[in-house]
Amino acid sequence: MKKYVLGLLIIALTYACNTKQETAQQIIDKAIAKAGGERYKNAEISFDFRKGTYKSERRGGDFKLERIMPDSTGTQYRDVVDNNGFTRFYKDTVVKLSDSMETVYANSVNSVHYFVQLPFGLNDDAVNKKLIGKDTINNKEYYEIKITFDVEGGGEDHEDVYMYWVNTQNYHVDYLAYSFEVNEGGLRFRKAYNPRTIEGIRFVDYENYKTDDLSTPLSELDDLYEARQLELLSKIENKNIEVKLLE
């Protein structure tokens, strides 16, 4: 009898260990590893997005994010965000800007690079992760992970809230949603498509959807997407992607 009870306990403990729920941190770690992992930290990545040409360079803790794009007058500028802040160049000359405009341009440059290199960046110090649960989209199971940001280190958009749907089998981020406060606020839902891997780093494009009902919880946007109740706002396509791994 004792052996029988002991056997049941061992089976129960083994089952409990095998079915132990992963934490949000563990899921994000796996998602980053699947998408490129350590390669992000020492790489040059360039791509074209809409009218701009973008380039990022990371070497350990040092980084530089660039954008070359004409303004409304056709004048071409090079915007740079690095460890020291933001700088705008016209040819090789530094262009003086007000602090408020520097913030606007810096956020714009950073935002494009951020989305292109997702899920890298989700382990930054100011990022808070919470596992909401699991859900199913198009018959595939996903972890739902909510992302918020600390005021300190979270940037000008620290009030934004994100939801990521991470595939429970391959740990790819196939969907994401976010709420934002600028320009009277809004909600967006994105579906990843056209995945490709270049030098071991995974990239995707996005279908970008919206809803005008700003009271909708982020966690319900996937249901609205499946019910075709979201409006396709745009497609976010990154072209001519090149990656150079640095030593």
Q: Where on the chain are the PLM-derived regions?
A:
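N-terminal leader/targeting segments and the immediate start of mature chains
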Residues: C17-T53
